[in-house]
Regions:
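Nucleic-acid substrate recognition interfaces
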Residues: 1-416
């Protein structure tokens, strides 16, 4: 299976200059490709009849559609912007200095652009989900995050070795890294990113499945805001140690908001603005590192103890909880599910997803009665019966339990 490992790079001065140059080159390729893409699209809209454009679009799926000679000539003169069209044009337009740089950077930039356009148009077709995919835009050198991608990187003598052009005559070294002990060999995919003047590499490696010993144990995990409950206890997703970081984030966000406005108008981005933005990103990075570390340890421990795990298939986007929304996103429901899914495959364990409409909170784990109408438990408890948010009382059999414990037992029943 493919696993992604993110490591911190420690390049020497020579390779640091090389990485900076490759980041600049990738941004140049992206902007050039976007300009060509938009030009081809505009020419196609202006010179091709709408019925011919529709016919060409249908021909992508239906190969039996035939074109007349004049239609073929028009389509050849004004091709559709695709990965192959744009990358071919950029390759023909290469300047001498570009041959000193790896060609994979250009092709990967065009590939990312094609995927970005595809995601943008797919999001516009969705009718039920929120459209949150923006149109591809030109990249600025002032962006806090820069990077490039390649599929020809290797690990040699515990160092990351990037591919270089055959005519490049300058010095080239392996780059030391920290984060994981990786075996020597080829890497399927490598993404280099520069964040806050630090370089990181995300390496996609084909990793064999490491089956853990059988324990014949089962558990269920009920995801709640700020904590996850399971059969042996509770796991805090947002511990107290993050409170100070969230206060710093709030402080830097307010500073940035003030620096965006000057005399009621949009202000220019000053050096101080980018300094504050860098500090804000460092705080976000620390929060992410802390929570990722905790989640990795928790999910790995779960699969070492249990063979079968049941979790809820939560629709986070549809969960509107007013004041709870911020804490909801901080609870990392989506990231938790992602970790559980890939580790189940990695360790050879079974992961069961409960239907998102399964009433684990309203169902009695003792008799199976499901609360409806005014009997339901809400975020404020139950006004009709005077119960609190964390209390579960079955009005049919009289069973009383903690609300989260009752939900865990209902989820656990799905493993039978």
């Amino acid at each position: 299976m493919d696993l992604t490992r993110k490591v911190r790079l420690y390049p020497n001065k020579t390779m640091l200059a090389v990485l900076d140059n490759l980041c600049d080159y990738r941004r140049y390729c992206w902007n050039q490709a976007l300009d060509v893409w938009q030009t081809l699209y505009q020419q196609r809209q202006e010179h091709l009849p709408s019925d011919l454009r529709l016919k060409a679009k249908q021909a992508v799926k239906d190969k039996s559609i035939l074109f007349a000679d004049n239609e073929k000539a028009l389509l050849a003169q004004y091709p559709s912007p695709t990965y192959y069209t744009v990358s071919g044009l950029l390759t023909k337009q290469k300047q001498d200095w570009q041959y000193q740089l790896p060609s994979r950077v250009l092709y990967k930039a065009v590939d990312d652009l094609a995927k970005a356009w595809s995601a943008f148009f797919d999001s516009r077709k969705l009718k039920t989900k929120k459209r949150n995919v923006g149109k591809p835009s030109f990249r600025s050198k002032k962006n806090s995050k820069q990077g490039f991608k390649t599929d020809r990187a290797r690990i040699i003598n515990s160092k990351l070795v990037l591919d270089k052009s055959r005519i490049y005559k300058g010095a080239w070294y392996g780059i030391p890294f920290k984060g994981y002990d990786l075996p020597d060999g080829n890497i399927k995919y490598c993404s280099i990113t520069k964040v806050n003047n630090k370089y990181y590499a995300s390496l996609v490696i084909d990793t064999p499945i490491e089956h853990l010993g059988k324990t014949n144990q089962k558990t269920a995990i009920d995801a709640n805001v700020n904590h996850f409950d399971y059969t042996e206890g509770s796991f805090a997703v947002c511990p107290k140690q993050l409170d100070a970081l969230y206060e710093q984030i709030k402080h830097y966000q307010r500073l940035l908001a003030r620096k965006r406005q000057a005399n009621g108008k949009k202000a220019a981005r000053s050096n101080q603005y980018f300094e504050v933005k860098t500090k804000l990103q460092k705080c976000y990075k620390r929060v992410t590192n802390i929570q990722n570390d905790m989640l990795h340890k928790f999910t790995t421990e779960i699969y070492h103890k249990y063979d079968t795990v049941v979790i809820e298939d939560l629709n986070v986007q549809a969960m509107q909880m007013s004041k709870k929304t911020k804490n909801l996103h901080r609870s990392l429901f989506g990231r938790f599910r992602l970790f559980m899914e890939y580790k189940a495959e990695k360790f050879g364990k079974e992961l069961i997803l409960a239907d998102r409409y399964y009433p684990s909170t309203q169902r009695c784990s003792n008799c199976g009665h499901v609360k409806t109408g005014d009997d339901k438990i809400t975020l404020q408890g139950n006004v009709k019966h005077g119960t609190k948010h964390n209390e579960y009382v079955c009005y049919k059999c009289g069973f009383e339990a903690d609300r989260d414990y009752n939900a865990v037992m209902n989820l656990l029943a799905l493993s039978e």
